[in-house]
């Protein structure tokens, strides 16, 4: 049986832009994507700490420090809001025993402040 687990988390990212006219998605700093293993067009869940909104969307790579809510998701937050971005995976019970997610705590400029090892 496969189970759903947290694979990666960007904790307390700061929204730097909201573009209602874009087709959709969330733009995330390419360096952060590399560090977490999140791929372009991968589905992610996003939780807005400021207003409690939660939504699912897909990722597109962006510039250094960039976190942009695009299209309809631009209605889910404003510049300056803090968000948590989650990526999940399905793994077997055997794989789960030694599995560790990648968790990055970010500062207000979306730089890695700390990598949490669980």
Predicted features and spans:
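Compact, glycine-rich, soluble single-domain proteins
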Residues: 5, 15-16, 20-97, 108-111
């Amino acid at each position: 049986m496969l189970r759903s687990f947290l694979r990666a988390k960007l904790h307390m990212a700061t929204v730097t832009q909201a573009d209602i006219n874009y087709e959709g998605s969330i733009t995330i700093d390419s360096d952060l994507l590399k560090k977490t293993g999140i791929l372009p067009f991968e589905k992610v869940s996003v939780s807005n700490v400021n207003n409690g909104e939660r939504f699912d969307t897909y990722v597109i790579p962006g510039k250094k420090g960039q976190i942009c809510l695009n299209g309809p998701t631009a209605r889910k937050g404003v510049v300056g809001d803090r968000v948590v971005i989650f990526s999940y995976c399905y793994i077997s019970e055997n794989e789960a025993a030694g599995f560790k997610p990648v968790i990055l705590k970010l500062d207000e400029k979306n730089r890695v402040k700390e990598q949490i090892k669980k």
